[in-house]
Swiss-Prot record:
A GO cellular component entry from the record: cytoplasm
Protein keywords: Cytoplasm, DNA damage, DNA repair, Hydrolase
Record protein name field: Uracil-DNA glycosylase
Organism: Borreliella afzelii (strain PKo) (Borrelia afzelii)
UniProt record similarity statement: Belongs to the uracil-DNA glycosylase (UDG) superfamily. UNG family.
Keyword Ribonucleoprotein annotated: no
UniProt-annotated catalytic positions: D67
Function noted in UniProt: Excises uracil residues from the DNA which can arise as a result of misincorporation of dUMP residues by DNA polymerase or due to deamination of cytosine.
Main localisation: cytoplasm
EC annotation from Swiss-Prot or TrEMBL: 3.2.2.27
Substrates-to-products reaction catalysed: Hydrolyzes single-stranded DNA or mismatched double-stranded DNA and polynucleotides, releasing free uracil
PANTHER family reported for this sequence: URACIL-DNA GLYCOSYLASE
HAMAP family, A to Z: UDG
Length: 223
């Protein structure tokens, strides 16, 4: 696995790529892809899709997921996203439901969130790879160290970013974010198991658009 990442990200993350934990992580992931016969997701070229879809300085919103979808052909390197021909997973269905209800718009009926990413939404999982049918199978191998650093770098070097933290894991990242510089929105995960614990009716998307407008940033179309 060679880290092929957009130039502005390479600049801010170069130190991280040279750390010992990251070198061990790369070695482990290479071995996984080589020996697990297509059962590691997403495909290698899409591991850093969230980074390659959005230059660092263009970030407006950060949405933090857990680890990639573990079903075949689902994960595409963007948190909560699937390719357009893939059935929309339940969590993303609930995200669309909240958008439609709160913003009074009709969402596009496909789950490819690249359309959000190119507008400034950084869709990052805390763990960037997974084995088929085994959620959290790549937990604790180094991805969390890396993505924590990514969140800290965004918080430190940018300003007036909206961070959407859904569920306990994402909310645990609050400590990495400077609340004096950014808007932090917290609620339950959009999973069917927890969507009614605050996610539906949270108005996160309304709050996000209001904040972007207040800070003279271009509106994001969440359709």
């Amino acid at each position: 696995m060679i880290v092929k990442i957009e130039e502005s990200w390479k600049e801010v993350l170069n130190n991280e790529f040279n750390k010992e934990y990251f070198k061990k992580l790369v070695k482990f992931i290479k071995h996984e892809y080589k020996t697990k016969n297509g059962k590691i997701f997403p495909p290698p070229k899409l591991i850093f899709n969230a980074f390659n879809s959005l230059p660092f300085k263009d970030i407006k919103v950060v949405i933090i997921g857990q680890d990639p979808y573990h079903g075949k052909n689902q994960a595409n390197g963007l948190a909560f996203s699937v390719d357009s021909e893939i059935k929309i997973p339940p969590s993303l269905q609930n995200i669309f439901k909240e958008i439609e209800k709160s913003l009074k718009i009709k969402t596009i009926p496909n789950g490819d969130l690249k359309r959000w990413a190119i507008q400034g939404v950084f869709l990052i999982n805390t763990i960037l790879t997974v084995e088929e049918g085994k959620p959290s199978s790549h937990k604790g191998i180094g991805w969390e160290i890396f993505t924590d650093e990514v969140i800290k770098i965004i918080s430190k070097n940018l300003k007036n970013i909206v961070f959407m933290l859904w569920g306990n894991l994402a909310r645990s990242k609050k400590k990495l974010i400077d609340p004096s510089k950014h808007l932090i929105l917290e609620t339950s995960h959009p999973s069917p198991y927890s969507v009614n614990n605050g996610f539906l009716g949270s108005n996160h998307f309304i709050n996000t658009l209001d904040y972007l407008k207040k800070h003279n940033k271009n509106k994001i179309n969440f359709q």
